[in-house]
């Protein structure tokens, strides 16, 4: 196979694997479904709010980053649970840190909304 054919096949495989992972998280994690609904609502408001295209892009990206953080959180939970189901402090700390990453990302998105809206309405 040529270089470009090989790279195309690799790219296609990565897309399929990524999609499969996203679908798995959506099917198994209620919090992911809740974040998707929040992103749909947030996305709607980005297009009706009197804000610039740049601000729209920033807000949409912030929402997408929450979804990425939720995927990473789920991946960490799966690996920790796969290693052992016994209660271990390091395992709990890893899971808590992954959850905190989602919370911090969501807080950053909320602060972004707040700053942009304050700029519009003040």
Task: Pin down the residues of each PLM region.
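Hydrophobic alpha-helical transmembrane segments
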Residues: 1-78, 83, 87-90, 99-122
């Amino acid at each position: 196979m040529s270089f470009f054919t090989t790279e195309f096949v690799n790219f296609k495989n990565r897309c399929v694997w990524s999609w499969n992972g996203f679908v798995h998280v959506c099917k198994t994690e209620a919090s992911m479904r809740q974040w998707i609904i929040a992103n749909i609502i947030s996305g709607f408001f980005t297009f009706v709010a009197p804000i610039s295209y740049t601000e729209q892009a920033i807000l949409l990206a912030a929402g997408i980053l929450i979804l990425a953080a939720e995927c990473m959180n789920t991946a960490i939970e799966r690996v920790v649970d796969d290693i052992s189901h016994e209660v271990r402090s390091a395992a709990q700390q890893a899971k808590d840190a992954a959850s905190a990453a989602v919370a911090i990302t969501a807080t950053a998105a909320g602060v972004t909304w707040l700053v942009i809206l304050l700029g519009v309405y003040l």
